[in-house]
Structure formats: structure tokens, C-alpha cells
Design a protein with these regions (language model features):
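Glycan-recognition and catalytic cores of secretory/periplasmic carbohydrate-active enzymes
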Residues: 1-393
Length: 393
């Protein structure tokens, strides 16, 4: 496994993070550019997204925590300062969805998903450095979500609200999503940062929130017939249950496992481990013989999106390494290694750096989508590298 760990460190440092340090830093307006397209062209006047910047903060903070390189601390601090100075809403709390290239608020809605990633980034910076300001911001954002986005009547977290925390008509994260008032994706990316915050801020109120989120996954989001996670719901937790998202399933399997491990409750862990193994088995329906994982299955019409998106492969690898580490299932190790070989051959851009967005169904590289942008950040792939470096498997 040492060879695999060495490979991960090399890819992390010389393919992923080096790209963001040399290509994406915005020296004129601060922070990082909002977009580098699939042909490596920088778009210096592109809007800057909260999710992208929070994920940059997380990635460099985590890299510094593990590797202790000063250039990673410098980049993490750059991201922290930018999110603090330009995305934090000092008047109403929470963070803006986007700012323009000069840092002026552009879309001021409060998307719970984005606030979750800000907690993830600030809590990781605090974990890596002990910085009190970063921890205080993460705690404040946690309280913003609990005060405004948590629905105590129906349980669960509301997808989006206006800047002033009032109801909003269009709650979608992106044009591809259904307009549901609560989604699996947002709940996944709330439990993930809450778990990380718990590592540095162990309080009963946060533990209660996390345990409730686990219950939401097992009681509301999990499809008891298929063991896939259903994606979109209304206030009463009614949904079409018509999409199977393999990448989200395998990502949830290891993130929910991580949460149970961090809470350190043996009875809870036993319950969650039985469930996450079933979720991972369901996710494996998306595997192909080369170890790669396809994107989605729409049960209406039985159609598949056969793209091999970069982030799905990252979560596929972590999820199967997690299963091998804790349950010693050799086939899961082989799946992870096969998927990594696919990534190394097809998705890594060894000439220009970073990873391509996807390999299309016809086998061609997807260059229509970004190398760096609103939804393309050094998060899934740097986390995959760091997970494989840090874990004992």
C-alpha cells in the first residue's frame, strides 16, 4: 500500500494543488479566479462561487494539516480571508451564493449546501492551525443553519432561502436539479461539515444535530427497497424516487461511516455499518468492468448517464478503500485500484495539470466543462488523495 500512498501524494502535490497555486490564484482581485475552462483558459472576470471558494479553503487546509507545507497554509489562509471578507453576510448571517470577480455580492440567496461547505472549510482550517477566528466563524454558520434552515415541524433542512432568510421560489442548486424543498445532497453536505466541526468543537447541541441527521438518512432518505438514497423531496418528505445517483450513494456510504466513527458510539456504529454496506452494494450497480463508475440511472424509461465524471471516481475509490479497511473485503480493494488505474489513464491531465471533468459515453474527454469553476474544485480529488494517504489499510 505504500506505493499507492506515494502515488497519491505525488498526484496531490504535483498534479492537483500545483495547478491551483500556479493557474488559479487571482493576484489582481484577490482569492482565486472564478473559472478556468476545459481548455485551461483563465476567465478572470467570471463570477466567484461560494462552494468553490469554501472547497478551496478545505482542500488547502487539509493538505497543510497532513503535509505541513507552508505554501499550503498560505493558500488556505488566502482562501479563508477571501471567504470571510467577501462571502460572509455581516448583516444577516450565512454566506452569499456568489460574488463578482471584484468581490461584490452577486447572488445573495442563502443556499444551505453552500453554508455547509463554508463550515467544512473553516472547521478544517481550525483543525489544521488551531485558529480561533476560523472556529468561531464555523460555529456561527452552524447556528445560522440551525436557526433559519432547520424545519423542526417536519424535520430536515430547507434547501434555500432569501438573503434575509425568507422563503424563496427557486431553491435549486443548479439547473439540473428538481426544485425540492429538501434534498439528499444538501443533507449529505450538512452532516459532512457538522462531523468535521465536531472534531474541534465537541458539544451536546452539535452531537444532537448530527444524530438527528443520521436518523434522517436512515428513516427518510434511504430507499428501503433498493438501498439507494433518494434525491428530491417536498416539505412532507414526499418524492418521486426516480433517480439513482451512484456517486452520491458511494460517497454517502463512507461519509456516514465516518460520522458514526467520529461520534464513537459502538451501538450506533454497528447500526450504521450494516446500512452503509447495503448502500455501497447498491452503488456498485454503477460499476463497469474497468472499475469506473457511471453517473446516474433514471428509472423513468430506464435510461443511464454513462459519463465517468471525475468526482464520482474519487468517491468510488474512497468508498471502496473504506470498505476494505474496516471489513477486509479484498474485492473492494481491487475495485478501488481498478478505478484508480482508470482515472490515471483517462482523467488525469498529465500535460497541463488537474483532472478533466469527465470521459463521455463515446470515450472522448469532456472539455466543454471546466477544469476549475463553480462546480470544479480541488475537493473531491484532493480529498481522495488525502484519505488514501492518511488511512491505515
Amino acid at each position: 500500500m505504500e506505493n499507492l500512498k506515494e502515488t497519491m501524494r505525488d498526484v496531490l502535490e504535483n498534479n492537483i494543488l500545483s495547478y491551483w497555486l500556479t493557474k488559479v490564484k487571482d493576484e489582481e482581485n484577490g482569492g482565486f479566479y472564478g473559472r478556468v475552462d476545459g481548455n485551461d483558459q483563465v476567465h478572470p472576470e467570471a463570477e466567484k462561487g461560494a462552494v468553490m471558494n469554501a472547497r478551496i479553503l478545505w482542500a488547502f487546509s487539509a493538505a497543510y494539516r497532513v503535509l505541513k507545507k507552508p505554501e499550503y497554509l498560505e493558500a488556505a489562509t488566502r482562501a479563508k480571508d477571501y471567504v470571510r471578507d467577501y462571502f460572509l453576510d455581516r448583516e444577516y448571517g450565512g454566506i452569499y451564493w456568489s460574488v463578482d470577480y471584484q468581490g461584490n455580492p452577486l447572488d445573495t440567496k442563502k443556499q444551505t449546501y453552500a453554508i455547509g461547505f463554508a463550515i467544512y472549510g473553516f472547521s478544517e482550517y481550525a483543525r489544521a492551525t488551531g485558529d480561533k477566528e476560523a472556529l468561531d466563524i464555523a460555529i456561527s454558520l452552524y447556528h445560522d443553519i440551525e436557526k433559519h434552515a432547520f424545519d423542526a415541524e417536519n424535520n430536515g433542512y430547507i434547501e434555500a432561502l432569501t438573503r434575509e432568510w425568507n422563503p424563496i421560489a427557486d431553491m435549486r442548486l443548479s439547473d439540473k436539479d428538481e426544485n425540492g424543498s429538501r434534498t439528499m445532497n444538501t443533507h449529505l453536505h450538512i452532516i459532512e461539515p457538522y462531523t468535521n466541526l465536531y472534531r474541534v468543537w465537541k458539544t451536546l447541541e452539535l452531537e444532537k444535530s448530527i444524530r438527528n441527521l443520521l436518523d434522517i438518512f436512515t428513516d427518510k432518505l434511504l430507499n428501503k427497497e433498493t438501498y439507494h438514497l433518494d434525491l428530491f423531496f417536498n416539505d412532507e418528505w414526499e418524492g418521486k424516487r426516480n433517480i439513482e445517483s451512484y456517486g452520491h450513494d458511494i460517497e454517502a456510504s463512507w461519509l456516514l461511516h465516518e460520522t458514526a466513527l467520529v461520534l464513537d458510539d459502538k451501538i450506533l456504529l454497528h447500526k450504521i455499518e450494516r446500512i452503509i454496506r447495503r448502500i455501497a452494494d447498491a452503488a456498485d450497480e454503477g460499476l463497469r468492468p474497468d472499475g469506473s463508475m457511471v453517473y446516474e440511472h433514471w428509472k423513468d424509461g430506464d435510461k443511464y448517464d454513462l459519463q465517468r465524471q471525475w468526482w464520482v471516481q474519487c468517491e468510488n475509490i474512497i468508498g471502496h478503500i473504506d470498505l476494505y479497511q474496516y471489513f477486509r473485503t479484498e474485492e473492494h480493494l481491487q475495485t478501488a485500484i481498478a478505478c484508480w488505474n482508470y482515472v490515471a489513464k483517462h482523467l488525469l491531465d498529465n500535460k497541463n495539470g488537474e483532472w478533466h471533468w469527465a470521459i463521455l459515453e463515446n470515450g472522448m474527454v469532456n472539455k466543454e466543462d471546466d477544469k476549475a469553476g463553480f462546480w470544479k474544485c480541488p475537493y473531491h480529488n484532493s480529498r481522495m488523495c488525502l484519505e488514501l494517504i492518511e488511512r491505515d489499510y
